[in-house]
Amino acid sequence: MLANKFDEMHHPVPDSSMNGNPLCNSSANVGQGNRNSNPIQSRGTGHSSSPIYNNPLRTAHPGAVLLSPQSSSLNIIDTTVGNAMSPTVPSSAASSIFFNDFGLDSSTNLNKSAMNANSNRPMTTIPLSSNSTSQSYTLSFQQENKKTNSNSTLNNVNNGLVTAGSVSNSHNNIFLDSFLSHDNTMQPNNSSNNNNNNNQNANNSLNFNTDVNQLCTWMSMLTANQQSVVMDNIISVLNESTLNYTKMKLDTMFGTTSSSPTSAEAMQNLGQPKESGNQNSNQNNIASPIPSTLDSVFANNSMKYLQSQSTSGSNHFHQAFNSKGSSMNWSSQASNIQNPAYDYLNDYRQRPKSAEPPLSHQTHYQPSNLSISQFKPQNSNGNSSNTNTNRNLNNSNNSNNNSTANNNNIGSNNTKRMNDITNSADVPVTSSFQNLTLNNQNGSTTTSSNNGNSSSGASSNSSMNPKSLTDPKLLNNIPIWLKTLRLHKYSDILNDLSWEKLIYLEDEDLLKRGVLALGARRKLLKAFTIVRDYKNRDLIDNSAYLNIK
């Protein structure tokens, strides 16, 4: 194709028909002064009359005359064809290489300054024909250059193609240059990197502490159920080491009972290095929203708990703690804060009397084969101890029938715990329990004092008071006797029996008579047992036997 173009430039095809084409006429008029043949091919349907080339019908590009010199590419091919192209063409009629043939858009911006500089130079157009295209190509050449060898012409055409390819890739080059320049600007020097890293680390540390404080504040505003849900989700994502640390801290929290020396002394006694404890305390002190609160209490209480464990011969906590290898100094602002709310966890012998549970909040269960002799006395000092013991024993007269022991084996503190157990038992009392009261008598106590203490100590359970149950007036009036037991709705069922017959009824007899409630039957059987025991020991007044039916 390039060879054909080269041949056509040196051997133009004459055309006899101009058909009124302004471009062709202009070229023809200019060419008459120098040559006899017209190099411009007509836009019409005329055939070429060249004796050398027998080319098919060829027409000019319909938009060739519409291209202005400002949009032509005069810098694509910067050469002329020497003496062969002497005619000149006005700059307004000059055309350029069509960009579509070189893969370019007509709107591609070229070097307009060069075009303006060369716009006044004489121009000429040469038709180019090939077997593969039907378009006319117009080439612009500068007149000053006089070199006419074929190699320079081919090189100029190739240079034009290369230039067109380079223009088509201009956008990509601009993009790559901007990308590389952006990368270069994004690389600071080493000193700025170090400063930025230090500032970033400081900001991260501050943000972490702020997040922890906000989390603690948010957790404190949640309800117990919401906190449980949050902890369930947090525990599921924690590491094993963190879970072990949390378990150790919880064990210490609920196993600690009282305050201890400072956290540093506790760390020394545990065999942990003091430096590691201080590091952990400094780290946790920053993240703690309220320092010196529970962490300080738990850290202070750890020493007292370890001392109590060592005196009782238990080394379980030491082994568990040493295996963890963790520090208990969670706060650097530890202080000797007294926390009496946890004193009852230490030992029941040291807890205050106010910590004793009231009788109305007792745990109800049914003991079996419970012996009071299992408890050892701690304060048995003559008559005062016996008086306290008698009062406590009389408080438990109403419920437990399995305890057989001596009063001298019961301490004042332990008997109160015993009363909490025995008062809640729902087992019928037998005569074996009454032997306990008789064995408690000595030189300073009498039966009358026992009865008086019994009546005063049984105010919490007046319905089962033996004194009221064995009162002759109540025994001779069954409806009133049942009313003391709060079972007066069964008066019509049991009113026809005397108290001596009534106390020997069994569970089946009560069920047959219409006492269907299990609790009512048990309560009646318990009262029957107390009255039978008093009758067997002749503790009931003789007036109760006068009005027997």
Swiss-Prot record:
Q: Where is the signal peptide?
A: none
Region described as Disordered: 1-57, 113-155, 181-206, 256-293, 371-422, 435-470
Enumerate the spans annotated as SAM domain.
473-534
Question: Compositional bias (Basic and acidic residues) spans?
Answer: 1-13
For this chain's UniProt record, which GO biological process terms are given? nuclear-transcribed mRNA poly(A) tail shortening; protein transport
Kindly list the GO CC terms recorded for this protein.
cytosol; P-body
Main localisation, per the record? cytoplasm
This molecule's function is given as: RNA-binding protein involved in post-transcriptional regulation through transcript degradation.
| Subunit architecture | Monomer. Binds to RNA.
The molecule here is called RNA-binding protein VTS1
